[in-house]
Amino acid sequence: MIITIGGLPGTGTTTTSKLISEKYGLNHVCAGFIFRDMAKERNMTLQEFSSYAETNTEVDNEIDRRQVEAAQSGDLILEGRLAGWILKKSDIKPDLSIWLKADPMVRCIRISERENENVDLALEKMISREASEKKRYKEIYNIEIDDLSIYDIVIESSKWDANGVFNIIEKAIENLKA
């Protein structure tokens, strides 16, 4: 089974992916972790590395390559804002493609708690990062990140806790056509 899950920062994709991975024994591959590791390798902050990635397409190419390679082996949950798009462009059809969304301030509060930052700083970083990513996705892939038409399910994650979001997805997985 191949599942993709995407969403902007703070929507709960990592928490949800881990729950799905544990329940169904799927390998968890996260584009964000790959991106963060690459930033650390270059001794850059996420904002610095996002700016660097805007003019250095090898960053996205490497992340894409790793995602496609992982998906070809099957039995995984692929987490990333473009995971669904990358597989579509590579002619790999996931069994289920999910997008999580949440109110920007809810996301900001979640990020500030996760990163142990004050809310104002988290908001500033979030806005900067998302603008950088949106620009990069359009320029490199001709993808509008706001186009959710490729997803089977879109969930407003601020309405439920992590288990509530997982329960919705669990029902969807259980009811997939064989």
From Swiss-Prot:
Localization, UniProt: Cytoplasm
GO biological process, one term: pyrimidine nucleotide metabolic process
Catalytic activity annotation: CMP + ATP = CDP + ADP; dCMP + ATP = dCDP + ADP
E.C. no: 2.7.4.25
Enzyme class: transferase
GO MF, one example: CMP kinase activity
SUPFAM superfamilies, per the entry: P-loop containing nucleoside triphosphate hydrolases
CDD domains (alphabetical): CMPK
UniProtKB keywords: ATP-binding, Cytoplasm, Kinase, Nucleotide-binding, Transferase
TM helices/strands, residue ranges: none
Sites where the protein binds ATP: 7-15
GO cellular component, one term: cytoplasm
NCBIfam families: cyt_kin_arch (TIGR02173)
Family, as annotated: Belongs to the cytidylate kinase family. Type 2 subfamily.
Name of the protein in question: Cytidylate kinase
Organism, scientific name: Methanococcus maripaludis (strain C7 / ATCC BAA-1331)
Taxonomic placement: Archaea, Methanobacteriati, Methanobacteriota, Methanomada group, Methanococci
